From Swiss-Prot:
SUPFAM superfamilies: L28p-like (SSF143800). It comes from the Bacteria. Keywords: Ribonucleoprotein, Ribosomal protein. Belongs to the bacterial ribosomal protein bL28 family. GO terms for cellular component: ribonucleoprotein complex; ribosome. GO terms for biological process: translation. HAMAP family: Ribosomal_bL28. The gene is rpmB. It comes from Ehrlichia ruminantium (strain Welgevonden). Pfam families: Ribosomal_L28. One of its GO terms (molecular function) is structural constituent of ribosome. This is Large ribosomal subunit protein bL28. InterPro entries: Ribosomal_bL28 (IPR026569), Ribosomal_bL28/bL31-like_sf (IPR034704), Ribosomal_bL28_bact-type (IPR001383), Ribosomal_bL28_sf (IPR037147).
Amino acid sequence: MSRVCDITGQTKSFGNKVSHSNRKTKRTYLVNLHNVTLFSDVLNRKFRFKISSRTLRTIDYKGGLDLYLLETSSRKLSDKAQKIKKMIKKATAENAKVSL
């Protein structure tokens, strides 16, 4: 079971544990992952993700999954998130054609 965020691709990072006497020992920082179900308003569909707390807070701040994916650069997103972003763009383009 890999500890990778499904949307951002964030993985564990490395650093040092520093003691009071300033000795440094290597350590890893794991990603705080949560299993969540997010709803896409444009696609009218639910998606299951394993995402980090930081990503979840950012999605809430941006106003939902659709707005987060559309405003975020594709190079910062994982392959799974890029596919969903492409589906959202396609659906919004079709809705724009229908409303004309």
